[in-house]
Amino acid sequence: MTMSHASPDAARSRIVLASNNPGKLREFAALFSTAGIDIVPQGELGVSEADEPHATFVENALAKARHASRATGLPAVADDSGLCVPALLGAPGVYSARYAQRAGREKSDAANNAYLVEQLREVADRRAYYYCVLALVRHADDPEPLIAEGRWAGEIVDAPRGAHGFGYDPHFFVPALGATAAELDPAAKNAASHRALALKALVARLGEIR
């Protein structure tokens, strides 16, 4: 598989994105487009969500990429990402999407955010970071997948702010920008986020693909 991003008229690469999350799809469509790569969401090809049984982001990302590639016969890229709070021993971590559900509550962004704020009620250290791992496989059994990561530092605030983004964005305040992730417009977020950093690292390695 070759990936060219020399000019808008050049043949663009086409790979499967192993996610059906609407928020992630919006972000990745914009981010990959800047790299000259067209993505096809796995849902459009009838691919189901892969299991995420692992305790690390990189293992989950690889499992999802291999699942999508095996089902479609195409190269695939997957991310596994989440919010990590050092004061909570890294939680929510790989369980970010179902943080509240694991505590017997509903599975939703609102429930996750409420539970996070509750867990930090008596905690002074509000440092947090979003973490993203991208895994790209040329085929399902690729022995040398490309792995890239990105980290976005911030802190957790009690009151939600902003109407953009998804997940924990309304509570994730970025001191360097003076705003929560949800207060950033999509272009600003895509320039600074953990996914943007991971993608830049991945794009820098695309020449390794033959």
Swiss-Prot record:
Any single biological process term in GO: purine nucleoside triphosphate catabolic process
Annotated active site: D80 (proton acceptor)
Note accompanying the cofactor annotation: Binds 1 Mg(2+) ion per subunit.
Catalysis performed (reactions): XTP + H2O = XMP + diphosphate + H(+); dITP + H2O = dIMP + diphosphate + H(+); ITP + H2O = IMP + diphosphate + H(+)
Pfam families linked to this entry: Ham1p_like (PF01725)
Domain of life per record: Bacteria
Record key words, sorted: Hydrolase, Magnesium, Metal-binding, Nucleotide metabolism, Nucleotide-binding
Gene Ontology, cellular component aspect: cytosol
PANTHER family linked: INOSINE TRIPHOSPHATE PYROPHOSPHATASE, INOSINE TRIPHOSPHATE PYROPHOSPHATASE/HAM1 PROTEIN
Assembly with partners or alone: Homodimer.
Listed NCBIfam families: RdgB/HAM1 family non-canonical purine NTP pyrophosphatase
Protein name listed in UniProt: dITP/XTP pyrophosphatase
Source organism of the structure: Burkholderia mallei (strain ATCC 23344)
Lineage of source species: Bacteria, Pseudomonadati, Pseudomonadota, Betaproteobacteria, Burkholderiales
